[in-house]
């Protein structure tokens, strides 16, 4: 994939080149999107809209840290959806990891979470954020133990993983495909910014329906699909149950009991 690759820290140019090689990124000087390695972090910028600011993964501070400390623990909807309230601590594969926020919440509650992000730029951002989180004095130890990013950023990532001899099937597959956002629905400024940038970078998630069948084959216990409250079921398949929040819905497809 082509994108502008820029290093603001001369000492990190070789790191940027390694990132580009790992995720298959090629430098395009004129690209509207830039992946920028600063002294602190890897960022995505939309060069024709500088007011949008930079997008980067922060698992240590800000909203993510607040949610970890005050988000409701195992009583929150996402925890119930993956079965944490049943006394189990499932192994979860997050098939649409994005910026890693939901995966981080599940890991903070004790789950081992394998993350798959198919878009190489988003995967590179997540990889950088994960590396920084592992260095943090407060959360680094358990982040390193419980969170991993699988290098599988192609459309058929789930099928590829199942074909690997050493792949251990997860108890739960978690999916949160990007969904078109109606104009009249309110979102926070941060989420609006990210959605705008991501939808113009990644494009519409037109093949999201195709994720459900391989997810159901992969998960030994259940598949959880996060949807906006106004969205139809993924692949038009009715879930076993749904857990509703103010703005979202967790559709749960049960393969087996959590015990």
Swiss-Prot record:
EC code(s) of this entry: 2.1.1.242
Primary localization: cytoplasm
Positions bound to S-adenosyl-L-methionine: 101-102, 117-118, 153-154, 176
Domain of life: Bacteria
An annotated GO cellular component: cytoplasm
Protein keywords: Cytoplasm, Methyltransferase, rRNA processing, S-adenosyl-L-methionine, Transferase
Catalytic activity: guanosine(1516) in 16S rRNA + S-adenosyl-L-methionine = N(2)-methylguanosine(1516) in 16S rRNA + S-adenosyl-L-homocysteine + H(+)
Gene Ontology terms for molecular function: rRNA (guanine-N2-)-methyltransferase activity
InterPro entries, per database record: 16SrRNA_methylTrfase_J, SAM-dependent_MTases_sf
Cross-referenced PANTHER family: RIBOSOMAL RNA SMALL SUBUNIT METHYLTRANSFERASE J
Record's protein name: Ribosomal RNA small subunit methyltransferase J
Organism: Aliivibrio fischeri (strain MJ11)
Lineage of origin: Bacteria, Pseudomonadati, Pseudomonadota, Gammaproteobacteria, Vibrionales
């Amino acid at each position: 994939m082509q994108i502008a690759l820029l290093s603001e820290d001369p000492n990190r140019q070789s790191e940027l080149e390694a990132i580009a090689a790992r995720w298959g990124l090629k430098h395009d000087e004129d690209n509207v999107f830039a992946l920028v390695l600063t002294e602190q972090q890897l960022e995505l910028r939309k060069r024709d809209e500088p007011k949008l600011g930079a997008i980067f993964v922060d698992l240590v501070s800000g909203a993510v840290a607040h949610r970890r400390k005050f988000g409701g623990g195992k009583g929150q909807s996402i925890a119930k959806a993956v079965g944490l309230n049943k006394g189990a601590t499932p192994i979860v594969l997050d098939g649409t990891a994005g910026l890693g926020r939901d995966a981080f919440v599940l890991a903070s509650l004790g789950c081992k979470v394998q993350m798959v992000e198919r878009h190489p730029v988003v995967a590179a951002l997540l990889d950088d954020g994960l590396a920084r989180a592992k260095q943090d004095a407060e959360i680094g130890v358990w982040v390193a133990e419980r969170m991993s990013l699988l290098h599988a950023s192609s459309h058929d990532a789930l099928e590829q993983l199942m074909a690997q001899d050493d792949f251990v099937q997860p108890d739960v597959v978690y999916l949160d495909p990007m969904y078109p956002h109606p104009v009249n629905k309110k979102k926070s400024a941060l989420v609006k910014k990210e959605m705008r940038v991501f939808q113009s970078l990644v494009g519409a998630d037109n093949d999201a329906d195709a994720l459900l069948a391989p997810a159901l084959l992969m998960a030994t216990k259940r598949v959880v699909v996060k949807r906006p409250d106004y969205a139809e079921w993924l692949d038009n398949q009715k879930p076993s149950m749904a857990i509703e929040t103010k703005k979202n819905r967790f559709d749960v497809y049960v393969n087996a009991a959590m015990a």
